Structures are given as C-alpha cells and as structure tokens.
C-alpha cells in the first residue's frame, strides 16, 4: 500500500476543505488545512485570483515545508464591472455571508434579469517547497437571483442561479456541486496535471 502523503490546503474554511478532501482522498493523500498548524501570517494583497492563490501557497509551503494548494475564488457580476471579484469574501464584512449577500442584492436592486449575468471563478495554485508550481482555473456561469434560494453551500451560493442546471448553487447536493462548481472544475483540471507536479 502506498504510504500516505500529506498536502496542505491553505484555508481554515471547513466547507472548502471538505470539497478538497472529497477529491483528494481517493488518491490516498492526507489533506490538512492551515487550522492544523500554528498561525501563518499571509498578506493577500494580489490584484488577481492567481496572484492571491500564489501568495497563499508560497507563504505556507515555505513555512511548513510541505506541498500546499491554495485557491482564490470570487464572484464576478457583469453589471458591477466584475465586482466583487477578488474582494468577494470581504465585500461587505470579513467573511460575513449574510452581509455580503445583502450588499449584492442591494447593488443589483434595479437590475433586470437579463442583465444579472455572473460567473464564479476559481484559480488553484499548487506550490511545493522547492517552488514547483501548478496552476488551474475553473468557472461556472449563471445569474444573480432576487432572493436567497436553497439551504446548502456557503457564501454567495443561495444567490447564484446555475444556468446549466436551472437551480441555485445552494439547492445542489454536494455531489452535484462538485460536478459543476468552479472549484470542482478547477480541481479536476488541477488533478489532470497533478501527477506531473506531484
């Protein structure tokens, strides 16, 4: 049996960690998160998703001397010029889903359905302690709803209507979400290149 290898996901978000766990566990890889280690100061001041993910992964890989995967994800709303974008988690308040969702609804109050187009984007960056880097991207297209819909997921999921499924992201099962989500798609793209990187 192959010896368990460890990879660190640069997040403390349990929901996000679970999505990685589901994808990486079948490969016999032990998944840890930043919550398993002493605090690491990470200055996420990038202008793009890839810059932020690279900062997170590099900082953690250097400090922990383990391979690290980091992602930066965001919601890009066309009517808002691509906002909230890299500021998605901190749009109204720091990782306050309710406040962020309320601010988004308010910003789009007068915007008709056909102009409420949006997409979720994820960039995943893997960095090994020797600096070897792997980058993958994923996106899912949709529209912003007028009210919170569905009980699952986190973040903007209840406001994001997935065009190809005809449901909000928060109405999907975990399996359905993994199939179509921006993170699921970025992760599958990442996994296709994983062996070469690993």
Over which residues does each language-model region extend?
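Anionic-ligand binding patches
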Residues: 5-8, 15-198
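Short, Lys/Arg-enriched N-terminal segments with co-localized hydrophobic residues
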Residues: 1-3
């Amino acid at each position: 049996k192959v010896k368990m290898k460890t990879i660190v996901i640069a997040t403390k978000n349990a929901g996000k960690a679970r999505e990685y766990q589901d994808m990486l566990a079948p490969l016999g890889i032990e998944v840890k998160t930043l919550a398993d280690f002493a605090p690491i100061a990470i200055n996420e001041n990038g202008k793009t998703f890839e810059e932020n993910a690279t900062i997170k992964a590099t900082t953690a890989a250097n400090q922990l001397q383990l391979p690290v995967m980091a992602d930066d994800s965001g919601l890009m709303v066309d009517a808002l010029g691509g906002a909230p974008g890299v500021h998605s988690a901190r749009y109204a308040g720091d990782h306050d889903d309710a406040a962020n969702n309320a601010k988004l609804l308010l910003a789009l109050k007068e915007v008709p359905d056909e102009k409420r187009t949006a997409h979720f984007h994820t960039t995943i960056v893997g960095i090994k302690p020797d600096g070897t880097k792997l980058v993958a991207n994923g996106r899912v297209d949709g529209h912003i709803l007028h009210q919170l819909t569905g009980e699952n997921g986190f973040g903007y999921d209840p406001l994001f209507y997935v065009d190809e499924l005809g449901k909000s992201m928060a109405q999907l099962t975990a399996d359905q979400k993994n199939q179509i989500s921006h993170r699921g798609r970025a992760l599958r793209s990442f996994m296709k290149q994983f062996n070469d990187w690993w």
